[in-house]
């Protein structure tokens, strides 16, 4: 054991602060001043801001005390005597070397490896206040990987840079049931990470952090089971997000500000069902929010089927509004504090009273309880004459106008009887198609969308009656006053009564000429459609989209992006109402512009795919390229083209694409980032690339859809893409989780992607040209060096021959050369010649 005494050295720099003095190791804070305000008590996550400071001797201080490099005599550094009270271990040339134990002034200790007088390698450093670090040291500084242990028992294990938590690591607090695992930057939570606020793991946050603050995108699960998924700012919900209150069966999706609903959003109240029953709707509000209240303009859909659209003030209907009752009657007028101000006009349906003036009559009607009750019964539909009941009352006014007035009553009665006889089967069909592509529903009810309705029409072969789906949309749009921009929208929802109304309208449009001379005509039209189309074919799903449950769920993640592509390439229809539609010709041009039409997918194959389920496309002789395609036909055609263009599983593209969803923090650690549609993305948007690749290999056409748009360019530039990955360049490809699977989805609109890809190809071409020029220069330089070596070798051999001829060597060892580089041989031979000349 070697003990060093304290000495005052005049040569030491008095102004230099001792690098290992207690002031270099301040006490570590135990409380988190930025504890979440809403998620836990102020002491719930305090210890996560513990920031270990630099504990070791600085390298630059050591260099000041080292002697001159040219001095061969090593002297013990002066500062060591002042800093280290005692040392046990080995020394080399006066410097600590190997394993040792040192006690510093102030009570700090170190046991571990030394190198050239510095703590270097594995070791354990304990501060005077009890904080301990076990791990790697690099020149007196904790680096790479280590474990911090605080006096209260809290621990951190993970990456360390400059004595601070930096990189990936896990922190556990001993005083509170709080733990964090994720990325750190300069001692603070920064990047992707998960924090758990209780021992059971039922209260947690997983997502983005910026300097100990939840900021970005993340998921917060509360102890009650309520879940928020969306954007954060300054530790509160802020931006776009979805909140689900499982305790009260509510859900809100929309904009947030400072932790409360603010802006546009949708709030849904899910009703508890009576056993063996279903509600067709849940209560839902779609509109503006201010500080958590319904405030501004909005729509409220009641579970009964009624709807209010108008102004709101602090959760109450206030101002001008339009209230549609469940039987279809409408009140349009002012509201005050959730009540109608003016009395609704029932157009003569209200009983008249003997008062001469309408004003007096109105006042009597408003005041008399019996009249008011009767009016409300009429408004609520309790006195409906429909055989189907008020909840399924059909709107037949437009169809009945096609018949003489004397026949209208009989036509209505007979068609209602027909619906009533088939209502069980029609309800089953509605429920079946409305649930396609839906993963879950809190109240086990589903709403049919236009996308489902199109699939129903195609399965039942409505389009085989010389009418396309686009034509059907126009017929229904004209009959029901649908806005032009929503005529072909796949997201429009249909209630059961709307579904029944549409069937009757299409039945009349398709068969009315056949039964125009027979009565009841409307009943016969519906009966034929039911017997020949609906009953034999319904619920037998065809097409690429809804034929497999797993494929459907996977493909539905592309609907929004493909809808953008579809609308971008639509053109106004020549005939009224001049809505945007896509013809088969424009579809083919779009594919050609994306370089998808190739040897695998020819124009002939394109026609065959479109004509598979569309008799209007090809009659055996001619092809109809003016055929209009609705979005369902467009989307299913893309899925079919994906099978043709990408026959093999696209897993090989995974390694070729740079992952844009990986962000690098200051420490160089990589973590996934998810930006997402809060409605369509799974709560756990962070998944490993390896598991995603394995999952994607099980997909068929849906997993190939994302690379379809630029598949031909990918195949041509695959080596270039690999090179760009090695150079750190990135392409616009998102890896997002959908059912825990890997999805290739272009982050740009498809009509813009070609320009981006052209720029990327141009950049790769310039890069390859530069690399080729560099390789050429390297080859020329290498060739010149080889020629020089050959010349030296030839000269050396000639020189050896000359030496041998002039004089034989005195002894054998001098004439035998061991294999070594040519230059060394020349030097050895020249030295031997010189020595021989001196002997002479």
UniProtKB/Swiss-Prot annotation:
<feature type="repeat" description="MORN 9">
    <location>
        <begin position="284"/>
        <end position="306"/>
    </location>
</feature>
<keyword id="KW-0963">Cytoplasm</keyword>
<feature type="repeat" description="MORN 10">
    <location>
        <begin position="307"/>
        <end position="329"/>
    </location>
</feature>
<dbReference type="GO" id="GO:0005929">
    <property type="term" value="C:cilium"/>
</dbReference>
<protein>
    <recommendedName>
        <fullName>Radial spoke head 10 homolog B</fullName>
    </recommendedName>
</protein>
<feature type="compositionally biased region" description="Basic and acidic residues">
    <location>
        <begin position="1"/>
        <end position="16"/>
    </location>
</feature>
<feature type="repeat" description="MORN 4">
    <location>
        <begin position="155"/>
        <end position="177"/>
    </location>
</feature>
<feature type="repeat" description="MORN 7">
    <location>
        <begin position="227"/>
        <end position="249"/>
    </location>
</feature>
<keyword id="KW-0206">Cytoskeleton</keyword>
<keyword id="KW-0969">Cilium</keyword>
<keyword id="KW-0966">Cell projection</keyword>
<keyword id="KW-0282">Flagellum</keyword>
<feature type="compositionally biased region" description="Basic and acidic residues">
    <location>
        <begin position="51"/>
        <end position="63"/>
    </location>
</feature>
<feature type="region of interest" description="Disordered">
    <location>
        <begin position="1"/>
        <end position="74"/>
    </location>
</feature>
<feature type="repeat" description="MORN 6">
    <location>
        <begin position="204"/>
        <end position="226"/>
    </location>
</feature>
<feature type="repeat" description="MORN 2">
    <location>
        <begin position="109"/>
        <end position="131"/>
    </location>
</feature>
<feature type="repeat" description="MORN 5">
    <location>
        <begin position="179"/>
        <end position="201"/>
    </location>
</feature>
<feature type="repeat" description="MORN 8">
    <location>
        <begin position="251"/>
        <end position="273"/>
    </location>
</feature>
<dbReference type="GO" id="GO:0005737">
    <property type="term" value="C:cytoplasm"/>
</dbReference>
<dbReference type="GO" id="GO:0005856">
    <property type="term" value="C:cytoskeleton"/>
</dbReference>
<feature type="repeat" description="MORN 3">
    <location>
        <begin position="132"/>
        <end position="154"/>
    </location>
</feature>
<dbReference type="Pfam" id="PF02493">
    <property type="entry name" value="MORN"/>
</dbReference>
<dbReference type="InterPro" id="IPR003409">
    <property type="entry name" value="MORN"/>
</dbReference>
<keyword id="KW-0175">Coiled coil</keyword>
<comment type="subunit">
    <text>Interacts with RSPH6A. Does not appear to be part of the axonemal radial spoke complexes 1 or 2.</text>
</comment>
<dbReference type="GO" id="GO:0036126">
    <property type="term" value="C:sperm flagellum"/>
</dbReference>
<feature type="region of interest" description="Disordered">
    <location>
        <begin position="810"/>
        <end position="840"/>
    </location>
</feature>
<keyword id="KW-0677">Repeat</keyword>
<comment type="function">
    <text>May function as part of the axonemal radial spoke complex 3 (RS3). Radial spoke complexes are important for ciliary motility.</text>
</comment>
<feature type="coiled-coil region">
    <location>
        <begin position="758"/>
        <end position="801"/>
    </location>
</feature>
<dbReference type="GO" id="GO:0097729">
    <property type="term" value="C:9+2 motile cilium"/>
</dbReference>
<feature type="repeat" description="MORN 1">
    <location>
        <begin position="86"/>
        <end position="108"/>
    </location>
</feature>
């Amino acid at each position: 054991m070697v003990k060093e005494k304290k000495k005052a050295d005049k040569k030491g720099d008095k102004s230099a602060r001792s690098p290992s003095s207690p002031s270099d190791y301040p006490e570590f804070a135990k409380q988190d001043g930025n504890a979440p305000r809403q998620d836990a008590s102020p002491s719930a996550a305090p210890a996560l801001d513990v920031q270990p400071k630099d504990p070791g001797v600085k390298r630059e201080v050591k260099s000041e005390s080292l002697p001159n490099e040219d001095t061969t005599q090593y002297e013990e550094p002066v500062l060591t005597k002042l800093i280290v009270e005692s040392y046990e271990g080995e020394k080399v040339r006066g410097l600590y070397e190997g394993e040792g134990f040192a006690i510093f002034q102030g009570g700090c200790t170190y046991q571990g490896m030394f190198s050239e007088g510095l703590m270097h390698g594995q070791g354990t450093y304990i501060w005077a206040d009890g904080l301990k670090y076990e791990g790697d040291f690099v020149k007196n500084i904790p680096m790479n990987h280590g474990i911090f242990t605080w006096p209260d028992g809290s621990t951190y294990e993970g990456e360390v840079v400059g004595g601070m938590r930096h990189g990936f690591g896990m922190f556990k607090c001993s005083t509170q049931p709080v733990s964090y695992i994720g990325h750190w930057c300069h001692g603070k939570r920064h990047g992707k990470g998960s924090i758990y606020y209780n021992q059971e793991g039922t209260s947690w946050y997983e997502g983005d952090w910026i300097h100990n603050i939840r900021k970005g995108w993340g998921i917060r699960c509360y102890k009650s089971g309520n879940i928020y998924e969306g954007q954060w700012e300054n530790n509160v919900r802020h931006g776009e997000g979805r909140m689900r209150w499982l305790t009260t069966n509510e859900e809100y999706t929309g904009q947030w500000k400072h932790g409360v609903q603010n802006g546009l959003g949708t709030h849904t109240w899910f009703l508890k069902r009576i056993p063996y029953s279903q509600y067709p709707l849940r209560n839902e509000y779609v509109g503006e929010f201010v500080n958590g209240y319904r405030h501004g303009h909005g729509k409220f859909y009641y579970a009964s089927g009624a709807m209010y659209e108008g102004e709101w003030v602090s959760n109450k209907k206030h101002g001008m509004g339009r209230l549609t009752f469940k039987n279809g009657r409408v009140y349009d007028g002012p509201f005050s504090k959730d009540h109608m101000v003016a009395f609704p006009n029932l157009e003569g349906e209200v009983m008249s009273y003997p008062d001469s003036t309408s004003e007096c009559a109105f006042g009597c009607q408003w005041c008399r309880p019996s009249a008011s009750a009767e009016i409300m019964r009429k408004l609520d539909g309790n006195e409906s004459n429909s055989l189907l009941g008020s909840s399924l009352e059909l709107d037949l006014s437009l169809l009945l106008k096609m018949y003489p007035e004397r026949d209208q009553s009989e036509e209505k009665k007979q068609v209602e009887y027909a619906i009533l006889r088939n209502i069980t089967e029609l309800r089953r069909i509605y429920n079946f198609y409305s649930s396609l592509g839906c993963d879950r529903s809190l109240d086990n009810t589903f709403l049919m969308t236009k996308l489902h309705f199109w699939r129903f029409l195609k399965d039942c072969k409505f389009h085989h009656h010389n009418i396309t789906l686009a034509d059907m949309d126009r017929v229904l749009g004209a009959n029901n006053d649908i806005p032009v921009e929503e005529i072909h929208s796949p997201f429009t929802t249909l209630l059961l009564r709307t579904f029944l109304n549409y069937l009757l309208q299409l039945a009349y449009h398709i068969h009315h000429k056949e039964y125009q001379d027979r009565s009841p005509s409307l009943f016969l039209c519906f009966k034929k459609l039911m017997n020949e189309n609906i009953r034999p074919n319904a619920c037998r799903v065809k097409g690429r989209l809804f034929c497999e449950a797993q494929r459907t769920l996977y493909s539905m993640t592309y609907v929004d992006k493909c809808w953008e592509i579809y609308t971008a390439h639509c053109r106004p229809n020549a005939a009224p109402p001049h809505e945007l539609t896509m013809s088969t010709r424009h579809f083919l041009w779009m594919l050609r512009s994306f370089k998808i039409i190739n040897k695998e997918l020819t124009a002939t194959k394109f026609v065959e795919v479109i004509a598979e389920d569309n008799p209007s496309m090809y009659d055996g002789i001619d092809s109809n390229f003016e055929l209009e395609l609705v979005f369902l036909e467009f989307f299913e055609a893309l899925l079919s083209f994906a099978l043709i263009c990408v026959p093999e599983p696209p897993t090989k593209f995974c390694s070729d694409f740079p992952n844009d969803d990986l962000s690098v923090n200051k420490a160089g650690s990589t973590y996934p980032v998810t930006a997402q549609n809060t409605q369509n993305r799974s709560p756990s948007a962070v998944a490993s690339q390896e598991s995603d690749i394995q999952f994607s290999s099980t997909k068929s056409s849906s997993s190939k859809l994302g690379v379809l748009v630029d598949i031909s360019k990918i195949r041509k530039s695959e080596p270039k893409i690999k090179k760009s990955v090695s150079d750190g360049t990135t392409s616009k490809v998102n890896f997002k989780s959908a059912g825990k699977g890997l999805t290739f989805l272009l982050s740009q609109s498809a009509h813009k992607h070609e320009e981006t890809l052209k720029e990327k190809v141009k950049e790769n071409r310039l890069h390859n040209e530069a690399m080729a020029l560099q390789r050429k220069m390297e080859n020329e330089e290498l060739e010149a060096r080889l020629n020089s070596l050959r010349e030296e070798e030839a000269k050396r051999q000639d020189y050896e021959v000359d030496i041998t001829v002039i004089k034989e060597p005195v002894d054998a060892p001098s004439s035998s050369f061991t294999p070594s580089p040519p230059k060394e041989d020349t030097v050895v031979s020249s030295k031997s010649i010189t020595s021989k000349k001196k002997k002479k």
